[in-house]
Amino acid sequence: GDQGATFGAVVDQLAHVGGRVILTGMGKSGYIARKIAATMASTGTLAVYVHPAEAAHGDLGMISKNDAVIAISNSGETTEMADIIDYVKRFQIPLIALTSQRDSTLGKRGDQVLVLPPHREACPMGLAPTTSTTATLALGDALAMALMVRKGFTKQDFGVFHPGGKLGRQLSRVNELMHPLSAVPTVTPEQSMADVILAIPSGRFGCCGVIDPDGALLGI
């Protein structure tokens, strides 16, 4: 339907943005915006989070005419968003609105509007952002994944951005982690353990190689 077409148009726009994707939101929406920005940045789309309140005190300078802004507000009436919305409209920076209310201030001013489906918050009082934040996060993740596909982002690219932790180890190549034998302290089989103890600290690898007269590695 209309939302599917809008989603596709947003992906097209973000895939061709010349600068960065700027995520902004206040309160719980701000935390969701941060996570979406982090997911995009780690999957091939240059993205950052800008706090809407801080934006009014100088951080608007972080947003350039080459960027695109995704503004998140469940109600679409977050007062702290007013200055950043005015700024992007003034300089004709693309504004993508993520909101539950198409007829809200944010919904009316967005160049593209992604409307969350009707929902009731899981909070017993129907007040605390729960269902809305989960739906927004899912929508943001969907955008990030669609951009991955559009840009042809590969496992190798993913590995470049994730050098640490289990993911980094799984995607790293041996030649990226290995140290040449010339960098490792070595001893011969005839040397004493005292020599080994003295040699190990010089390489800072916590080990020592044992080599034969021809320099071939016999063991560690």
Put a short name on every predicted segment.
Residues G1-A15:
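An N-terminal, well-structured beta->alpha segment
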Residues K108, A122, V149-H179:
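Internal, active-site/partner-interface "lid" segment
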Residues V187-R204:
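The conserved cystathionine-beta-synthase
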Residues L177, I200-G203, C208-I220:
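A glycine-centered beta-loop-beta connector
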Residues G1, A68-S73, S182-V184:
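Short, basic, glycine/proline-bearing loop/turn elements
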Residues A15, R20-M26, G30-A138, A144-L147:
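Glycine-rich phosphate-binding loops that contact phosphosugars or nucleotide phosphates
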Residues A5-G8, F153-F158, V210-P213:
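Flexible, glycine/charged-enriched surface loops at secondary-structure junctions
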Residues T6-V10, A55-D59, D195-V196:
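Short acidic active-site motifs
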